[in-house]
Amino acid sequence: NEKAAQAAGIAYDKVVLFPASHAAYYPGAQSMAMKVLYEKKSLRLLGAQIVGGDGVDKRIDVLATAIRAKMTALELTELDLSYAPPYSSAKDPVNMAGFMIEDLESGKVQQFHWNDVEDLPCDGSATLLDVRTEGEYRRGHLNGFRNIPLDDLREHLDELERDKPVYVNCQTGLRSYLACRLLTQYGFSCSHLSGGYSFYQVVTQEQQTARSAYPCGMEKL
């Protein structure tokens, strides 16, 4: 995990994704939260954590085997895993983690993490953009982020300043990735929030709970 990598002095990065347990069009798909760590220099896999129900065990088994085999993160893209709509997707979540790392390391996209959010410039020197729907934005959003839904982004490009870096957020990281690819093609310097608002909300709430309660769960007075 990250604490072990930090204790070992390893320069690492991570990807966070929320894939479905099997093809989303087939009934009964469940969401899972995946985090995959890799070493920056060698790209070797360091570890993985998955939270969910159906399908979690086999993805962990695949990743554990890949780590044991000393595979690089990019080699995850080449794994030809079993597929049928009730059990997986044409591109398995393990493949998708590899593709995300490939995009990062090739420079196609840049990301920032939940613990970077409070350090983002709020003085107008950067554009903070939330590309979720208006309803999602109203239910909760990061301070200082302006809402332009992804479907409307092309119509609002002239409102964004190209000489300012853009930090993009969505619910799980997919729409912010797509927004960054679009903005990059139009000449913007762009980064998106790894794991999106969902991951940020879970992690920060857990930290708040940890600070205000004892390990047993009793609130501190």
Predicted segments with their positions:
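Mid-to-C-terminal Rossmann-like scaffold of FAD/NAD(P)H-dependent oxidoreductases
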Residues: N1-G53, P85-S89, P93-D119
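Residue-level marker for well-ordered alpha-helical positions
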Residues: N1-K3, I60-D61, Y177
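Anionic group-transfer/hydrolysis microenvironments
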Residues: L37, R132-E134
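Rhodanese-like catalytic fold shared by cysteine-dependent sulfurtransferases
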Residues: L74-A126, E134-Y167, Q171-L221
